[in-house]
Amino acid sequence: MAYTPDFELVHIGVNCADEAQAAECAHKFELLFQLAVNPAKESADARFTGTQIEWMKKPGRGEHGHLALATADLPAARRYLEEKGFSFDEESIKHFSDGRVLVIY
């Protein structure tokens, strides 16, 4: 049987024009859906509502944003997606201290 990755949605990243727009969007989302702005996940690049909606403080990867996925076997999942015609940006790779790939776009 063919390998199928066990993808899990980690978060949805939404590109905003700037920090002010990210704050406004996060606030509106909080009002609409009762998902509080999450200061624990705040960074120089993004603001979160809850744990799964990331409001980018400047345009990031993708035209509108990105979907962050996790999988137990990243190398196998990468091969699976490449076989389906998807490509990756080698310059985007971030590694764990032991050399394993942590993130790739």
Identify the function of each model-found stretch.
Residues E19-Q34, A76-G85:
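Amphipathic alpha-helical segments
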Residues M1-E24, G62-L69:
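N-terminal beta-strand motif that seeds the catalytic metal site of vicinal oxygen chelate
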Residues M1-F7, N38, T49-K57, R79-Y105:
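Vicinal oxygen chelate
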Residues A40-A44:
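Short glycine/proline-centered loop/turn elements that form peptide/ligand docking sites
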Residues I12-V14, F33, V37:
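Compositionally biased, intrinsically disordered low-complexity regions enriched
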Residues Q52, G60-E63, A72-A76:
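Short, charged/polar surface micro-motifs in flexible loops or helix N-caps
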Residues N15-A17, T49, M56, A72:
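A structural detector for beta-sheet-dominated domains
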